[in-house]
From Swiss-Prot:
UniProt KW keywords: Isomerase, Magnesium, Metal-binding, Phosphoprotein
Function text: Catalyzes the conversion of glucosamine-6-phosphate to glucosamine-1-phosphate.
Alphabetized PANTHER family for the sequence: PHOSPHOGLUCOMUTASE (ALPHA-D-GLUCOSE-1,6-BISPHOSPHATE-DEPENDENT), PHOSPHOHEXOSE MUTASE
Reported modifications of this chain: Activated by phosphorylation.
Gene: glmM
Entry keyword annotation includes Ion transport: no
GO CC terms in record: cytosol
Annotated source species: Cronobacter sakazakii (strain ATCC BAA-894)
Classification of source organism: Bacteria, Pseudomonadati, Pseudomonadota, Gammaproteobacteria, Enterobacterales
Annotated protein name in UniProt: Phosphoglucosamine mutase
Amino acid sequence: MSNRKYFGTDGIRGRVGDAPITPDFVLKLGWAAGKVLARHGSRKVIIGKDTRISGYMLESALEAGLAAAGLSALFTGPMPTPAVAYLTRTFRAEAGIVISASHNPFYDNGIKFFSIEGTKLPDEVEEAIEAELEKEISCVDSAELGKASRIVDAAGRYIEFCKGTFPNELSLNGLKIVVDCANGATYHIAPNVLRELGARVVTIGSEPDGLNINEKCGATDVRLLQERVVAEKADLGIAFDGDGDRVIMVDHEGNKVDGDQILYIIAREGLRQGQLRGGAVGTLMSNMGLEVALKQLGIPFARAKVGDRYVLEKMQEKGWRIGAENSGHVILLDKTTTGDGIVAALQVLTAIARNHMSLHDLCSGMKLFPQILVNVRFTPGSGDPLEHDTVKAVTEEVEQALGKRGRVLLRKSGTEPLIRVMVEGENEAQVTEFAHRIADAVKAV
């Protein structure tokens, strides 16, 4: 990726009220995007958001900017990110825009774009938008200004799409499922999808108030879900993040089932049904246990850089159809164009219903290696801690100690000023000690 001023790995993101997530910048962003997108002929853009209170302000700013450039906005209201990608395709809109900071706290927000195909915008389009941002804002003639309207049946359209990815001959009758919607964008979607397919549904994290998105709930914190699954004697639990593009599951014993295990289940089921094309894509963070388990099944495995856009790029490069991050981004190109938590969960539920097996049993063919992740905050602009000699030396020592039976990965977060230190190996105590040793070295520089 080229060096850009505003667009990161997942659009533009930051704290609301601080540059660039301010009303004036977002208005200009809408205008700049409108100027670039108008060159392609279409005059309509889908705008969706999660449940953050700042979404109202930011969608109004985007609408004003787009209208000034001559594009009309179609609002979905609170809607999962993958739903916006789907609606962008079905409405033949020139682009889709999602106002969300995904799994971040409510005081953050962000803007990301989808192309007419429902995929992330190509780099060159993002670069063209950045170039327009450097210009003075202008307005088209009054007769050419854009309009705004709402898609009144957006939720219903997406619910039917999700249900369509679950086999007609199967149902979820007899399954009791606890669903944690992270007080986010899936709150009015996921429970209805599961109920309409026959499940008994218990909901948590489904009362958004604009401030409680991702707060001690959802895919980034499944402790409450684990407790409720056990207390309710449910068959399983499903947790989404604030914008619905991630999913983490919990088995009937309260054990967490992450994106690596979900990818394993979906890949194995695809192999059993003769529907798996090629192999599966993970990331540098994917557990070694996934690689070992897939190898035992004869399924090729490739690692991409961390970030769903890189998983997708690797899938396209290989011509493969399934990929995932252990954080719960699961991309299934036979079903949709981007990471979709609900669709991914439905494919796991397909394996449960078809094989009459529990989620716990479906995971049993894959043994996770102990993997310790430590996040270390650093001050932006203070130099790169990863390039410091002390950090390099400690990392090398750990790598030599682990040999071929473990891995070390240090990387910067694409969305926050964090260094992520990951150490993986067969001995949990050793791996934990190594991870904190490296993290301490990073903190000290």
